[in-house]
Curated annotation (Swiss-Prot):
Gene3D superfamilies: 1.20.1270.10, 3.30.420.40, Actin, Chain A, domain 4, Substrate Binding Domain Of DNAk, Chain A, domain 1. Residues 593-620 are annotated as: Disordered. The modification Phosphothreonine is found at residue 197. SUPFAM superfamilies: Actin-like ATPase domain, Heat shock protein 70kD (HSP70), C-terminal subdomain, Heat shock protein 70kD (HSP70), peptide-binding domain. Induction: By stress conditions e.g. heat shock. It holds the Pfam family HSP70. Belongs to the heat shock protein 70 family. One of its GO terms (molecular function) is unfolded protein binding. This is Chaperone protein DnaK. Acts as a chaperone.
Length: 620
């Protein structure tokens, strides 16, 4: 087994590191730099440029220069974020089997293929640096990357000729690099604001254990968004002065993007900067120049809501971890965008403690990934990395309820099973709808996928035992299987492609769950009362039909009337929990005489005892 490299495949820049000689080292690229621009360009001569060389020619070749590809990695074409990216990016985004892809000179490329070209460059540079072949890697992703995005990242590694040993979360990787030598237990918060993504994670480190307590973020919030605010401001100012919509000119837009990024960087150390773009465009009156001063105060006002959005996520993640701000002992700042003074100022003010800037924000994630590579190879001993799943996972059960199988915050890898049953007599198949989210009702959560388990042996409802197993691997990739315990027949689905969950949806789910908590609980109580009533009516009717001859006519009619009344109540969509419970209670009391008659019948069959492991929920 050769050396395992750790790769931070970033939106704006990428970095790599290796663990050797009992320490993690950043690997410089062939240009001698510790980071490589995550940019790929296709020239008119048929060349493919990656990194610095691609960045240098971007202004003259904007439509064939691909940057921020991570923003559409694993994204479905019909998602709002894809439409947003389409407006912002100069290259053409197209629909390929429902997923986002790009078109260059009539040829379609997937985000995995473009990312693979970046990874190939990193792989070649690492081989040059190490003097040996590199075939294995640990690659990092934002903590809030969904299953589809994680799989796409792993596929990019495969295309690049790398065996991706592990996909790990960026803030967790940073904590691994920061906390490896910490002997005393510390609760640290990693604030990771990169070029295109934002993550905040609260972890406990110490004694060579790095355990994630809670994580949150937004896979579509980063330095690019800060740049875009400057671009929009400059374009609006230019239009007011000249009447020209500069954003319609892709070459001008590329120049504007570079100028906005440089202005943002300059304002990290200066209070004012001048943006000077001569001959940015032209009209009938002649060439036009863009010259504009931008103060730090104006930049901060343009981006204030973006910074505040990160603060609100910090608050919710600390709450999810079951901690208070005072219990956070260190705040580790990661990602190039944390150099923005206002970001540092707001995080410091919110947490009320000095920020830890001892780590290089551009390199620490790759360093942590290389340490994880060392762990997997056996070079790093006794280090335990415990990550978590960001949202609950479950299936839809009778009445449209979301029944959770794996709870949010469960340490991964994880494998959990529950036993369900059928909703109808002699039901030949069950449909398993896999869900992700925090709401009580299935329709309010994200559907990840659906599959059918066929060939269930004929049996009364509630008798078949269908074991549903959720298996999340160490990369956070989910497989769901279902098995009929009586026949042994099974079916499984590996969640992928269109089943991915966008990060904006995740955030909305968490917020909606909080807002609708009481309402959802009431709805669930009504559904559970209806399910219980339906089960009682069904079972009592079956028993009455079988033992009616052992009852006098008045008792039999009383029980039948109670069954009918309960069935009418069940059919009424507006029936309340109290009404359902009253009718259920009435039938229970009426059916006591039926129970006595059955007990008195010497040859009455004893009902089969319900399996203790069977969950009181049914699959439609």
């Amino acid at each position: 087994m050769g050396k395992v490299i750790g790769i931070d495949l970033g939106t704006t820049n990428s970095a790599m590191a290796v663990y050797e000689g009992n320490e993690a080292k950043i690997i410089a690229n062939k240009e001698g730099k510790n980071t490589t621009p995550s940019i790929v360009a296709f020239t008119d001569k048929g060349e493919i440029l990656v990194g610095e060389s691609a960045k240098r020619q971007a202004v003259t070749n904007p439509e064939k220069t691909i940057y921020s590809i991570k923003r559409i990695m694993g994204l479905m074409f019909n998602e709002d974020k894809a439409k947003e990216a389409e407006k912002r990016l100069p290259y053409k985004i197209v629909d390929r089997n429902g997923a986002c892809a790009i078109e260059i000179s009539g040829k379609i490329y997937t985000p995995q293929e473009i990312s693979a070209k970046i990874l190939m460059k990193l792989k070649e540079d690492a081989e040059s640096y190490l003097g040996e072949s590199v075939t294995e890697a640990v690659i990092t992703v934002p903590a809030y990357f969904n299953d589809s995005q994680r799989k796409a990242t792993k596929e990019a590694g495969t295309i690049a000729g790398l065996n991706v040993l592990r996909i790990i979360n960026e803030p967790t990787s940073a904590a691994l690099a920061y906390g490896l030598d910490k002997k005393e237990s510390e609760k640290i918060m990693v604030y990771d604001l990169g070029g295109g993504t934002f993550d905040v994670t609260v972890l406990e480190t110490g004694d060579n254990v790095v355990e994630v307590l809670a994580t949150g973020g937004d896979a579509f919030l980063g330095g690019d968004d800060f740049d875009n605010r400057v671009i929009d401001f400059l374009a609006a100012e230019f239009k007011n002065e000249t009447g020209i919509e500069i954003k319609n000119d892709v070459m001008a837009l590329q120049r504007l993007k570079e100028a906005a990024e440089n202005a943002k960087k300059e304002l990290s150390s200066a209070m004012e900067t001048e943006i000077n773009l001569p001959f940015i465009t032209a009209d009938a009156t002649g060439p036009k120049h863009l010259v504009k001063k931008l103060t730090r105060a104006k930049f901060e006002s343009l981006t204030e809501d973006l910074v505040e959005e990160t603060i609100s996520k910090i608050e919710s993640v600390i709450k999810d971890a079951g901690l208070t701000k005072n219990e956070i002992s260190e705040v580790v700042m990661v990602g190039g965008s944390t150099r923005i003074p206002k970001v540092q100022e707001r995080v410091k003010a919110f947490i009320n403690k000095e920020l830890n800037k001892s780590v290089n924000p551009d390199e620490v994630v790759a360093v942590g990934a290389s340490i994880q590579g060392g762990v997997l190879k056996g070079d790093v001993k006794d280090v335990l990395l415990l990550d978590v799943t960001p949202l609950s996972l479950g299936i839809e059960t009778l009445g449209g309820v979301m029944t959770k199988v794996i709870d949010r915050g469960t340490t991964i890898p994880a494998k959990k099973s529950q036993v369900f049953s059928t909703a109808e007599d002699n039901q030949p198949a069950v449909s398993i709808m896999v869900l992700q989210g925090e709401r009580e009702l299935a329709r309010d959560n994200k559907s990840l996928g659906k599959f059918d388990l066929q060939g269930i042996a004929p049996a009364p409802r509630g008798m078949p035992q269908i074991e549903v197993t959720f298996d999340i691997d160490a990369n956070g990739i989910l497989t769901v299987s279902a098995q009929d315990k009586n026949t042994g027949k099974s079916q499984e689905i590996k969640i992928s492609g269109s089943s991915g969950l966008s990060d904006s949806e995740i955030e909305k789910m968490v917020k909606d769950a909080e807002l609708h908590k009481e309402e959802d609980a009431r709805k669930k109580e009504v559904i559970e009362a209806r399910n219980h009533a339906d089960s009682l009516a069904h079972q009592t009717q079956k028993s009455l039909d079988e033992h009616k001859t052992n009852l006098n006519e008045n008792d039999a009619n009383e029980i039948q009337n109670a069954i009918n009344a309960l069935k009418d109540c069940i059919k009424n969509d507006n029936a309340t929990k109290a009404e359902l419970e009253d009718k259920t209670k009435a039938l229970t009391q009426a059916a006591q005489k039926l129970g006595e008659a059955m007990a008195n019948k010497n040859n009455a069959e004893q009902p089969k005892k319900k399996d203790d492991d069977v969950i009181d929920a049914e699959v439609e």
